[in-house]
From Swiss-Prot:
This is Ribosomal RNA small subunit methyltransferase J. SUPFAM superfamilies: S-adenosyl-L-methionine-dependent methyltransferases. Keywords: Cytoplasm, Methyltransferase, rRNA processing, S-adenosyl-L-methionine, Transferase. HAMAP family: 16SrRNA_methyltr_J (MF_01523). It comes from the Bacteria. One of its GO terms (molecular function) is rRNA (guanine-N2-)-methyltransferase activity. The gene is rsmJ.
Amino acid sequence: MTELKQSIQPIGIFFNAQYPSLEAICQRWGLVFDKEAAFELVFENNCLVLNKRDEPKLKGISVDFVSGAVAHRRKFGGGRGQSIAKAVGLKQGVNPSVVDGTAGLGRDAFVLASLGCNVTMVERNPVVAALLEDGLRRAYESEEIGDWMRERMRLVHGSSLESVAELGEEIDVVYLDPMYPHREKSALVKKEMRVFQSLVGADLDADGLLAPATALATKRVVVKRPDYAEDLDGVKPSMVISTKKNRFDVYVKAAMKA
């Protein structure tokens, strides 16, 4: 399910140390107890949840691949006609292997896996990686989606795409969705995203992702950007697939073949 590729600098987090399962998760991901930490990890209904301690009215953040919005998108989101599917090159007889180099909460990775891609998620923030692993655990146990989730979706915890390159596997597509500062005032930004951004910060080194992504991918690199953002690292893409608020910049290296 999860491969730990390298140690990460410990991050402080608040949790109830009387719960062995929480303590074990924090030890596994290099999270150290900090009573002054802004964030807290808790278990709610067999689900690992991240809460922002100074905003108790905000809903906690968790990863749920089985129900909720991502499940609705899997069932009713348009299948392979979705822009993200076109961007990675999904078509009849072609199910690319994909590395999501900026996994976040795993939603785009899940869409691609549900459409037939084998997806390896890379997440360098250990708190987010812990949430992802918990989401995968519950998805793997699901009667509805468990079988194909175990086959198509996994997590690698590491600080860079080199973590995947070390595995020595051939990767068709590298998918990147770097955190980009919102243009709107903070009150207009979705609350969950605001909390998430305050945890992980902006990807200030995002431009440095394109070169290793291009080296790793054998077929193409796909970069998801807000419609107002500049090209990643100033490099013009081979083609652009636009949606209402975002676009997918596609850097083609070789044709997809069935």
